[in-house]
């Protein structure tokens, strides 16, 4: 497990004075600023100060960003928080970052693939699986009925996929 977790991303500039559109991946979107200092993928640290709520996200300022050009240059940049600053999760909840890369086996032990991404389009989380024998990606509902076991220490997920999915 990484010592950093992606908690948001820069969606682009907001205005001409260096404000940014921030997409928070936190359960409570405004909590993203409470995990300061944040860092970029390359490890550079920054501090986020939220300035308001806007359509599809938040507006805010990052240290060192003072104009639209600097804000535009950060479009798509991911923001990371130190894992030890994040709340401890109950046993049946997981950070998406911890699921990516885990091997997924069916209840008979056959490897189905590895988790490539975790998506949520409003109706619940979906695990995107890729692997040998799959023509492309397969989306597996991340529910207790379909995914009864997640063992982070062993790097393994046991799934009971719906009939006909594989």
Swiss-Prot record:
Q: Name one GO molecular function term.
A: ribosome binding
Q: Extract the InterPro entries matched here.
A: PRC_barrel-like_sf, PRC_RimM, RimM, RimM_N, RimM_N_sf, Transl_B-barrel_sf
Whether rRNA processing counts among this entry's keywords is yes
Tell me where in this chain the PRC barrel domain is found: 91-165
A GO cellular component annotated for this chain's UniProt record is: cytoplasm
Q: Where is it mainly found?
A: cytoplasm
Q: Which GO terms describe its biological process?
A: ribosomal small subunit biogenesis; rRNA processing
- Provide the protein's localization: Cytoplasm
Q: Which domain of life is it from?
A: Bacteria
Which keywords appear in this protein's UniProt record, sorted alphabetically?
A: Chaperone, Cytoplasm, Ribosome biogenesis, rRNA processing
Q: What does this protein do?
A: An accessory protein needed during the final step in the assembly of 30S ribosomal subunit, possibly for assembly of the head region. Essential for efficient processing of 16S rRNA. May be needed both before and after RbfA during the maturation of 16S rRNA. It has affinity for free ribosomal 30S subunits but not for 70S ribosomes.
What is known about its subunit structure?
Binds ribosomal protein uS19.
User: Could you give the domain comment from the record?
Assistant: The PRC barrel domain binds ribosomal protein uS19.
Q: Which family does it belong to?
A: Belongs to the RimM family.
Can you say what this protein is called?
A: Ribosome maturation factor RimM
Tell me the classification of the organism that encodes this protein: Bacteria, Pseudomonadati, Pseudomonadota, Alphaproteobacteria, Rhodobacterales
- Tell me what gene encodes this: rimM
